Each structure stands twice: as C-alpha cells, then as structure tokens.
Amino acid sequence: MSRLFDSRLADIIRKPVITEKATNALDLNQYTFEVDHRAAKPQIKAAIEALFDVKVIGINTMNPPRRTRRVGKFSGKRSQIKKAIVRLAEGDKIQLFPES
C-alpha cells in the first residue's frame, strides 16, 4: 500500500449501517457499511482488513440515488452515499455493539 492510501483508510469507511435488514445479514457473516462514494472495491477491502483485522471474501456495493429535499421554497439534494455489504471469512467477526 502507498502512504497516500494509508492515510485515507479511516476516511473510506464512514459508519456501519444499522437497519433490520443489515442486522439480519449479520447471521450470514455480512456487515453493511456506508463508505466514501469514490472508493472502489479493492480500497474498501483493504480498509476493512486493516482497520478490523479480518479476512474479506466478498464485497457488494450499491449507489442509491440522491434524494431531493425541500426547505421552504429552496430545493436541494442530499449528499451522495455508497453502501458496501462485506462478507467475512468463516470465524472472523467485527464487534459493532459493545458487550454488556
């Protein structure tokens, strides 16, 4: 990895997506993250493997359309997001919730 990419690792992964569908996918060892919309699959894979110390065996990405929002008479668009569904090797796990 180049030094430029090393400094960007934490910027590629924005946050985990916690929805009912994403929570059900945890049983299949699949984790859903919101990522930078310019990131490619190899960059996402390298970032997940480096940040969480796991082995990624597959990535599916999606670019949902931007939604239009209105505030009074002004119309605008929300920022572009990209979601990545990451499938981990058997036995690997990412701790999303703190254990109690």
Swiss-Prot record:
PROSITE patterns xrefs: RIBOSOMAL_L23 (PS00050)
Keywords: Ribonucleoprotein, Ribosomal protein, RNA-binding, rRNA-binding
Entries under InterPro entries matching the protein: Nucleotide-bd_a/b_plait_sf, Ribosomal_uL23-like, Ribosomal_uL23/eL15/eS24_sf, Ribosomal_uL23_CS
Alphabetized Gene3D superfamilies for the sequence: 3.30.70.330
GO cellular component: ribonucleoprotein complex; ribosome
Domain of life where this protein originates: Bacteria
Molecular function in Gene Ontology: rRNA binding; structural constituent of ribosome
A single BP term in Gene Ontology: translation
Coiled coil: none
Family to which the UniProt record says this protein belongs: Belongs to the universal ribosomal protein uL23 family.
NCBIfam families: PRK05738.2-4 (NF004363), PRK05738.3-1 (NF004365), PRK05738.3-2 (NF004366), PRK05738.3-4 (NF004368)
Main function: One of the early assembly proteins it binds 23S rRNA. One of the proteins that surrounds the polypeptide exit tunnel on the outside of the ribosome. Forms the main docking site for trigger factor binding to the ribosome.
Oligomer and partners: Part of the 50S ribosomal subunit. Contacts protein L29, and trigger factor when it is bound to the ribosome.
Name of the molecule in the record: Large ribosomal subunit protein uL23
Lineage: Bacteria, Bacillati, Cyanobacteriota, Cyanophyceae, Synechococcales
Name of encoding gene: rplW
